From Swiss-Prot:
It comes from Homo sapiens (Human). The modification Phosphoserine is found at residue 84. Residues 13-58 are annotated as: Disordered. This is Active regulator of SIRT1. Pfam families: AROS (PF15684).
Amino acid sequence: MSAALLRRGLELLAASEAPRDPPGQAKPRGAPVKRPRKTKAIQAQKLRNSAKGKVPKSALDEYRKRECRDHLRVNLKFLTRTRSTVAESVSQQILRQNRGRKACDRPVAKTKKKKAEGTVFTEEDFQKFQQEYFGS
């Protein structure tokens, strides 16, 4: 809150909490005293804001103005109204440009698994070799 608003609030509270006489002791009052114009003008000057032509603002209005608003519905309306589809190549290019040059930002390249190497020889070749080598 601004200092002017605090001062105004304190003035209002001070006026309501002014020392009052106990109810049993009433002072005899005479005719009401007229305040001179000068004091009225000074009091009116105090109530006015310091800037020319400004109207005192409500604290609730100030709060509502600064209060966080949820823009989800407005954003969703906007997004659903604009249904322009972008080409896949364009979107991939945008994603590529937004990626950094560090290794952690780059996609992992998939490595191809090597197939298990099979034997060149067949079972018959092994049996033939066994008979020639061992002679059985």
